[in-house]
Structures are given as C-alpha cells and as structure tokens.
Amino acid sequence: MADKKPYYITTAIAYTSGKPHIGNTYEIILADAIARYKRSQGYDVFFQTGTDEHGQKIELKAEEAGVTPKEFVDNVSGEIKKIWDLMDTSYDKFIRTTDEDHEKQVQKIFKKLYDQGDIYKGHYEGMYCTPCESFFTESQLVDGKCPDCGREVQPAKEEAYFFKMSKYADRLIEHINTHPEFIQPVSRKNEMMNNFLLPGLQDLCVSRTSFKWGIPVDFDPKHVTYVWLDALTNYITGIGYDCDGNSTEQFHKLWPADLHLIGKDIIRFHTIYWPIFLMALDLPLPKQVFGHPWLLQGDGKMSKSKGNVLYADELVDFFGVDAVRYFVLHEMPFENDGVITWELMVERMNSDLANTLGNLVNRTVSMTNKYFGGTVTDKGVAEEVDADLKAVTENTPKAVEDKMEELRVADAMTEIFNLFKRCNKYIDETMPWVLAKDEAKKDRLETVLWNLIQSISRGAELLESFMPSTSKKILEQLGNGHVTEKPEILFARLDLEEVLKKVEELHPPVEEEKEEEDVIDIEAKPEITFDDFGKMQFQVGEIIACEEVKKSRKLLCSQVKIGSQVKQIVSGIKGHYTAEEMVGKKVMVLVNLKPAKLAGVLSEGMLLCAEDAEGNLALMTPEKSMPAPGNKARCT
C-alpha cells in the first residue's frame, strides 16, 4: 500500500490571557472540520494547536491574580485544552510555548539570526500596546490609540534587538505575486501588499527588557524574546525543527505546512513577519495562510472587556456539542464576519437540526420498522422520481469536495443539508404512508425506504467531518437497511422564551454606563445641537476590496482601510457602482456607528454619499489627495 500523502494543518495558538469565548473557539472547530475531511480523503493528517504563554500582558494578569506567571498559564492553558476537547476536536499535538524543547529552540533560532546578521542591537522608542503585544510608531496610531484593538498605548523606550525586515521584503513580495494561493482570501493579500509591504517595512523590535515573562536571549539574558518571534516558531518546533541541522524525520515529512488557519486580525504577523523569519532560516514558506473572519456576538467583535462574550461550554449546555459545531461552521461566510446570538442558535436548532435532519431520520427509521420490521432491501421497483434523489446523492460528495478545496466550509455544509432537504422532499413526493395501504405496492414501498436509507447514510458519512457524533448516531440507526427498533431523537426543539429566560438567570443583566458612541439615527432631525453632531466621527478610508452581497439586489460589502484598521461596511450602492469600481476609491466613512447585520452580513459603519432628485448616489470623496487613509473629516 502506498504511503499516504501528509497534510499539516495548524491553528494560531491561543493566547493564555483568559478563558476562550466562542469567537476564539470557532477557529479550532474550523480547523478540525478541515483535518477530519482530509483524513476522510486518505491524507496522513497532522493537526497542531496549542497555547501562547509569554508576554507582558500575562505577567500583569498573573500579578493581578496573585500567582506566578507559570501558575497562571498552567491554569488557563488547561482550561483552553478542556474546551478544545469538549468541542470534539481531533488535534494531534497541543504545544505550549512554555514547553522546554520549544524554549530551547527559540533561543537557538534567535542566536542563529543574530550570528548571521539578521538581528542587531539598538534602542527602541515608540508606542506599545500591551494587549496586542505590538509596537507602533506615532504615525501608525489611530486617534492616539492602537490601530488593531483601539486600546490605549504606552510610550516605550528601551534597549532592544531588531530584525532587518527590509532585507527580505522584495523577496516576500515576489513570493506573494508568484503564489496567489499563499494568502487567502484575496482581500487579505491586498491589505498586506498595499498597506505594509509596498510602502516599505521598518525593522522589527524582537526583544524587550521592561518585563521578564518571556524566553530569555541566552547571550544577553536581560532581554526576553518578542512574543511573536516566540509564538510563530511553534509551527516548526512542534514538529521537531532544530536549527543546528538535527531536525526530526517528522519535520522533514511535514514541513512546509499545508495550511496555517488564523484570525484575520493576526494575518500581518503570519504573512509578513513569519515568512521573513523563515526566509532568514532558509526554510520553505507555508503553502497557504487563511485569515478567517470573526464570529461576532450581534453587537461587534467579542471582547471580555465589552461584556459581550458567549462561551462554548455554556452554549454546549444549551444545545449540545454538534449543534454548536454546526452553527459556527454553517453561519460563517468565507470572507465576511458572521454573527451569533441566542436567537439565531435556537432558530437553527429548530429548523435545520430538529426538523430538516432529526425529523428526517426519525421518520425513516419509524416507517422502516412499521412497514418492514426494521429491515429493507432494494426491490428495484424504480420510478422517475427516484432519479433526481439518486443524482443529488451521487453529486453531493463532489460538490462538498470542491467547496472544501476552496476552504468554503459553510458552503460544503449547505451541500450536505441540501441532500437532506431533498430526502424530505422525496418522502413528500412518494408518500410511503399511501403506498403502505396497497399490498400490490409493497415492493415499491420497500424500494422507496431503501433509497431513503442510502441517501441519508451518504449524507451522514459526509457529515462526519463537521458533526462527528451526529454522523455516527445516524449511521448506527440506519444500519445499511437494518434500522434500530426505536429512533433516537437527534435534536430536540427548543422554546426561545425558555432559553432566553435561562440565559438571563445565568447572566443577570447589568446596567451599562452610557457610552459616548451611541447608535446614530439615520433619519435627520429638524435641528441638532453642535454636541449632537460632534458624536459622529467621520474619517477618510480607502476601499481595498469589495464584493456583492449574496441574495441582495442592492448591497455591496466593502473592506475599507482606515488608518491601520480595516472595517467591513455594507452599503446600498450596488445600483450605482460595481464592486470592481469601488476598489481603490477614497471615501468618507462614518466610523463610530454601532455595527449591524444587513442581509446576514455585518456592517461596521456607513459610507457618505450625495443623492440627486432622481435618487442617484455618488460617493463623497476628498477633493485633494490625502497622504494616507484614516485622516479625520471636520466641519469649519
């Protein structure tokens, strides 16, 4: 038997600053679905995840908790692993950056890069964001705050080591241009090229002296290694890389990675810093980096500081593991952010899982028992209506494969559930309960039930990658024509009011302080005060990507670069501009509008337009060329 082709997939390692919410957990579930699917195709999959455990933020968190940093990360890492296991993820290795072998390799890598002249000693002076563990110049800040998370930054001035990023920039640009699959989706590639690589890279600070919780630079121990140089190398240290030339057989088998699956907020680190580090180490680059969108909790990106957090274990208590897996995989678009709420979860639970799937299996098992004592065979009494069901059944595996090759996991799940919907329609078309009344049609009835069992079973086999427990339960009940005596209820319908009542008991509402950035009415009032007007914040943005919103005749979804941030904005402008025409335009953006979902797609602001008497729209753009997106708009 020929050796299986290896497939190495990784997630970003989870930062151990606290318990992961469902937005964090989405990534491990997504990676697990891909890993399981690749295994089903015959690949020898190695799936690595883990925890990122160093940095100033953790040092401060541990101090607040009254424990050592190691005690703090031991506890949080254990909690993260517990949740990953709860979600039935099939990872092969859980790496921790406090693992002794990882720390030793990071020190050796740092020394190698220093010895060959890629790292040099200097002094850093600028701004530092502790939550993001990132350095910024004054010009990179947005309103004086971190361009990535919007939090306050602190001035930093200290002796530091720097990596010569510009030395490898042209080589990285060439690689990206000649390997279009390297950064996905394409909008993420455009953002990295236009906003970081093409304007020119600054040398990167790769050590700190202002805190101690990190991997010491062994030849200068007052310095600790920059957390991103430490964390990113887990992808190679976890599979046995040794920069002295003693890498393991596993490393040579698995590297380069087939897929780094990460959140869109850390794509800069994985598509600029990490490839350049690898080039300096003379290692091949990963084949693909996919920056997935965020899973939002109705009113924006989940953040414990905002109090809008949903946790996976709480959702599992209400819905079960596979229902949560189904929701986060099915509801996440390929590129745009998805939304999760208790209401949407209950809706999907009842319509898709309890009705479309659960009721289908229940009816099929019950009818097979009722009419044939639990066992059917193919009597071959075919009718025209059978052909379409068989065609859908035969075509679904290829449709799923095509979607999974593009990492369109939500679309792959839709294909499977379309098969289940077709099975339900087949029951309505053939009406087994009517056939059962005519003894002469008994063989036809048995054929119908046989067809149903075969089609549902094929769908269940495909479902294993996404909902493994449910897949197993369905196949056990159907038994290739020998069904169980009593159908097992796969998913029970839920009452929304009861669920919301329990949620309120679990999380009593807390009176929130009124924020400055309230939702702004889109209908003008007769008069407003200057203070009212001052609540609205307009900035210049540049549209770096745009696409049509599915199932909408007038909406476009734009990725708008504002300073160092990218906002997703859905606008009703499709009849006035094409998606292609939007890209590259400088626009005026209302940036502090509360996020809302339009046609199922999250929008984080609004574009300012002029409208004539006929309703034609024209984007408002700066008259003069502005040096960079992010400039404020003001009235004088």
Task: Describe every region a protein language model picked out.
Residues A2-T49, D101-Q105, P155-K370, T414-I416:
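Structured secondary-structure scaffolds
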Residues A2-V76, I95-F110, D115, C132, ...:
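N-terminal catalytic cores of NTP/NDP-binding nucleotidyl/phosphoryl-transfer enzymes
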Residues S77-D92:
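A glycine-rich helix N-cap at a beta->alpha junction
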Residues Q116-A169, I173:
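Cys/His-rich short segments
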Residues K121, L344-V381, V392-F491, L590:
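Helix-rich, typically C-terminal accessory recognition domains appended to large enzymatic cores
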Residues Q288-G291, L475-Q477, C557:
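Beta-strand segments within the central parallel beta-sheet cores of soluble alpha/beta enzyme folds
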Residues S471-D532:
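Intrinsic disorder at enzyme termini
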Residues E512-T636:
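Phosphate-backbone binding interfaces of nucleic-acid-interacting proteins
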